[in-house]
Amino acid sequence: MEDLGENTMVLSTLRSLNNFISQRVEGGSGLDISTSAPGSLQMQYQQSMQLEERAEQIRSKSHLIQVEREKMQMELSHKRARVELERAASTSARNYEREVDRNQELLTRIRQLQEREAGAEEKMQEQLERNRQCQQNLDAASKRLREKEDSLAQAGETINALKGRISELQWSVMDQEMRVKRLESEKQELQEQLDLQHKKCQEANQKIQELQASQEARADHEQQIKDLEQKLSLQEQDAAIVKNMKSELVRLPRLERELKQLREESAHLREMRETNGLLQEELEGLQRKLGRQEKMQETLVGLELENERLLAKLQSWERLDQTMGLSIRTPEDLSRFVVELQQRELALKDKNSAVTSSARGLEKARQQLQEELRQVSGQLLEERKKRETHEALARRLQKRVLLLTKERDGMRAILGSYDSELTPAEYSPQLTRRMREAEDMVQKVHSHSAEMEAQLSQALEELGGQKQRADMLEMELKMLKSQSSSAEQSFLFSREEADTLRLKVEELEGERSRLEEEKRMLEAQLERRALQGDYDQSRTKVLHMSLNPTSVARQRLREDHSQLQAECERLRGLLRAMERGGTVPADLEAAAASLPSSKEVAELKKQVESAELKNQRLKEVFQTKIQEFRKACYTLTGYQIDITTENQYRLTSLYAEHPGDCLIFKATSPSGSKMQLLETEFSHTVGELIEVHLRRQDSIPAFLSSLTLELFSRQTVA
């Protein structure tokens, strides 16, 4: 809105300017040129120039306003484009995440489908193997049935032979009515038994058909394990029926006994042939009875017709046998077939029990392996946590080393200030002695640092090996997880790998304990080195000055040391020469003459003793100053501060009611900038102050000051 107002003002000023110029032009044209003075022309020219300048300014302002408008529009368009781009980017990112999630879901589904396909293939292979076994069993059963058919054919031949014998007996027994009647009665009984046997065969055929139907149903439902139990129940019912059949087949021995009796009678009839001569005498009497025998022959013809009918039934039975595919012609064959079915059923039950037992064992092994995997993963997590704690401890130790180096530098500065107060005459022997001690300490520190660096390198190598082993363990865990997933599908995971993993875990635990001990030793050595003035070369940089007094002093000490070594060698040579009793070389005599006298040695000893006394005084002064500083802090703050353990400080108030009333603070940060109040018996009595000043305000000085005021008020009230 402000831009529109400015634009309208610019347009109005432009219009007024144009009107003014047109009026001036018209007025100027009406005037006479001769009457106008040159001064008025100059004024008009100046005014016209000013008006043109104003017009230019107004035009430039309008142009600037238009440019600013275009700029604002461009910025708005850029903002809109950015917003649209950000929206498009967010939508594309969301779509990408959705696509990634969908891909992951599809991958998981594909894996599940692959696993299901593998399981289905395994089940199909198992079913094919079972079908092959069933086919083999059926082939064996068909072979047995063929053998039984052969045995039935032999039995038919024997029956035909018996028929021939019966015909012979009829011709021989024509003259014996009583015997023929008995034979006829026996034949009738045999026919009845045959009828019973035919009925039993029909029932057996029906049962065989039922068994075939059950076999077909079982072959159709073998793919499903659950339906096997139902089939087993059906087979048990069939077994009960077969048992009933067995009870009926027990009657077969009685028929065999009757056959034996018939054979004995045939033998007896053979003997009767011998007595045929005697029977011929009775032939006349038997001719009278011929009419009766003719009637008997008619009955025999009827019996033969019935026999033919029975033979037709036998042939139809054999045809049914061939059409059904089961070679069962006798009850014995049926009993054998039933026994085979029972044996197959028992074998299937044994296989089922073996499969279930193996599945249970594999399931138990899988569960044990899963537990072992969980234990190994837990141990790995513990190892990682311990490694993190060790790294944190190493960082704390490094920070502590830095603090100790700072304290050492402060102590050196204090000692330097005390040394600066000494006179130059007293300073030089003390400096030389201190430089010697410093050089010895430097050599010791260098040697110790070399040892520590070697130990640190070994520890780092061992840590690297430990990390590699941890990585190997992680890879083995991943392999174990993949193997456990495959074991859940196929149950083929072995316990040997679990035992090896246990051994590896035990070895790693031993190595971890050993590394922890080495780490503790290294931490102790680092503390000692820090107390001795060592520093971390990777983090602390030492600057060496070109004209360093310490380097000059060291150079002098080295020169003095070399001179002293040369003098010692000369003195040793002198002693050897004197012991041998030979002449002393001139250079050794000169060296002996140049040695310091006993007075100089006594003076040097006095200087050393005075330096030691000065150091002792400095230590005493330092201790007294520290005591004074602590007393001043105690009187000023009202709290006595004592260091109990590492990073723990005990504060005892000046106005404490009991000597055991104290507060314990623990430094949570290495620099000591953050403190944490530990729980004590006295802290339970000041819970309100802790809640107000520490938890809400987070101010330890306010808490301590309020605590001193409260204790002071208690003492004054008391």
UniProtKB/Swiss-Prot annotation:
Modified residues (Phosphoserine): 16, 214, 428, 598, 610
PTM comment text: Phosphorylated; by BUB1. Become hyperphosphorylated in late S through M phases or after mitotic spindle damage. Phosphorylated; by TTK.
Gene encoding the protein: MAD1L1
Protein name, entry field: Mitotic spindle assembly checkpoint protein MAD1
GO cellular component, one term: MAD1 complex
Motif window: Nuclear localization signal: 79-82
Effect noted on mutating residue 299 to A: In lung cancer cell line; somatic mutation
Family: Belongs to the MAD1 family.
Oligomeric form and interacting partners: Homodimer. Dimerizes via its N- and C- terminal regions. Heterodimerizes with MAD2L1 in order to form a tetrameric MAD1L1-MAD2L1 core complex. Interacts with the closed conformation form of MAD2L1 (C-MAD2) and open conformation form of MAD2L1 (O-MAD2). It is unclear whether MAD1L1 dimerization promotes the conversion of closed to open conformation of MAD2L1. Formation of a heterotetrameric core complex containing two molecules each of MAD1L1 and of MAD2L1 promotes binding of another molecule of MAD2L1 to each MAD2L1, resulting in a heterohexamer.
Alphabetized UniProt keyword annotations: Acetylation, Cell cycle, Cell division, Centromere, Chromosome, Coiled coil, Cytoplasm, Cytoskeleton, Disease variant, Isopeptide bond, Kinetochore, Mitosis, Nucleus, Phosphoprotein, Ubl conjugation
GO molecular function: identical protein binding; kinetochore binding
Phosphotyrosine modified-residue sites: 634
Disease: Mosaic variegated aneuploidy syndrome 7 with inflammation and tumor predisposition: A form of mosaic variegated aneuploidy syndrome, a severe disorder characterized by mosaic aneuploidies, predominantly trisomies and monosomies, involving multiple different chromosomes and tissues. Affected individuals typically present with severe intrauterine growth retardation and microcephaly. Eye anomalies, mild dysmorphism, variable developmental delay, and a broad spectrum of additional congenital abnormalities and medical conditions may also occur. Defects in MAD1L1 are involved in the development and/or progression of various types of cancer.
Record has Coiled coil as a keyword: yes
Presence of the UniProt keyword Membrane in the record: no
Segments of this protein annotated with the region Necessary for interaction with NEK2: 380-532
Effect of residue 569 to K: In a breast cancer cell line; somatic mutation
Residue numbers spanned by region Important for interaction with IK: 301-340, 439-480
GO BP term (any one): cell division
Compartment annotation: Nucleus; Chromosome, Centromere, Kinetochore; Nucleus envelope; Cytoplasm, Cytoskeleton, Microtubule organizing center, Centrosome
Modification N-acetylmethionine occurs at: 1
Modified residue annotations for Phosphothreonine: 716
PANTHER family according to UniProt: MITOTIC SPINDLE ASSEMBLY CHECKPOINT PROTEIN MAD1 (PTHR23168:SF0), MITOTIC SPINDLE ASSEMBLY CHECKPOINT PROTEIN MAD1 MITOTIC ARREST DEFICIENT-LIKE PROTEIN 1 (PTHR23168)
Chain residue numbers at which the record places covalent cross-link Glycyl lysine isopeptide (Lys-Gly) (interchain with G-Cter in SUMO2): 61
List of residues that carry N6-acetyllysine: 61
Annotated function: Component of the spindle-assembly checkpoint that prevents the onset of anaphase until all chromosomes are properly aligned at the metaphase plate. Forms a heterotetrameric complex with the closed conformation form of MAD2L1 (C-MAD2) at unattached kinetochores during prometaphase, recruits an open conformation of MAD2L1 (O-MAD2) and promotes the conversion of O-MAD2 to C-MAD2, which ensures mitotic checkpoint signaling.
